[in-house]
């Protein structure tokens, strides 16, 4: 990777912010591979120059997790306040006017994260000795924070752990909900590390018109789907916030520490809270942040507070963890690292993500083979032409075709995926044929998941959700 060019050439504070983040990653990479001192010194000098330019432009010091303009509450939490041509992403709303979906390169700049480039993918392959997951090969996980730092630790035999989660708002999960768990399972397998899975039933109670009994019931049902992804009970702890907060003083102490060091003004700026929001919403971000710190799980880590955390999640969850990364050094903990995924689009198109609240926008894990076929044929947005003649002549548009997008997530064979892309783009393959390819992938995927889920008993769920020592030993 070459040095970032001079800060004065950046067209905006956002671009300058992104340049600093990229240069910071370069410095870390050079140090990790023990590059010559002159090369490291040159990169550090460039980084300091960029930070000076940023301070001159913004009137304040660069902060890694606070992109310029990101703390203004005027439009946060209100997608209607955003220009129709702009993408809008927060933990509750994803919207774009583009049929191609969110512009993820712009989002990297806006959020101040770093792109997962080929160099990083290759480094993961070298570190694990395993072929990169298709989600990495195809840019589905596209952005990160401090992944090089995690790899540095791993290569030096230092431990880390994984943290991901699920907000249980319905009894049935859809195929889009599988994305973080499929990838997290792969990460756990190749790195051989512990995993904690937060079931944020408290969040869903605060945000949705649901009872405590309903959200807790959804937690238990969703836990069965998560377990059915193949996680090892000896390496995985799944917990309900409603349960765990009351039985783990270490977890609650971290929640309180975070709450003390984050102001109401900060959470308003990050999450768009208003004066009419209940106080539970305002305090919830601290609960989602707490699993990022290892001493929140004394039964696993025996009180150690310095074990690095890696969080695979969709990028709409990043605001929670920007806040977490900002507060971590102030309470004496390492910043969590993150791997961000793209959104799984609704059947009707990539302008929004798949939603469990709209049955026609989603392929549920409870759907029958017939329901899957009907939904894909009837609702999946097509990039094909209006007539067969036009399609044969001009070809289809894979960039907007939902069936092709879904195949990029679930079809393992890279060569077959590329052949489908070529055939559809050239007009050799028709929309109906492309949809059949997707149906042939989704039907067995869902059926196999259903078969595994049937094997998950209430006793197995209880075992996964019981606080206990896992098969890792910490001093």
UniProtKB/Swiss-Prot annotation:
InterPro entries linked: aa-tRNA-synth_I_CS, aa-tRNA-synth_Ic, Rossmann-like_a/b/a_fold, Trp-tRNA-ligase, uS15_NS1_RNA-bd_sf, WHEP-TRS_dom
The UniProt GO MF terms for this protein read:
ATP binding; tryptophan-tRNA ligase activity
Q: What organism does the UniProt record list as the source? A: Oryctolagus cuniculus (Rabbit)
Output the Gene Ontology cellular-component terms.
Answer: cytoplasm
Region (Disordered) residue ranges read 61-87
The protein's job, in short, is: Catalyzes the attachment of tryptophan to tRNA(Trp) in a two-step reaction: tryptophan is first activated by ATP to form Trp-AMP and then transferred to the acceptor end of the tRNA(Trp). Could also possess an angiostatic activity.
Instruction: Name a single GO biological process.
Output: tryptophanyl-tRNA aminoacylation
Task: Give the gene that encodes this protein.
Answer: WARS1
UniProt lists the family membership as follows:
Belongs to the class-I aminoacyl-tRNA synthetase family.
Q: What interactions and quaternary structure are annotated?
A: Homodimer. Interacts with oxidized form of GAPDH.
Carrying N6-succinyllysine, the residues are: 158
Q: What is this protein called?
A: Tryptophan--tRNA ligase, cytoplasmic
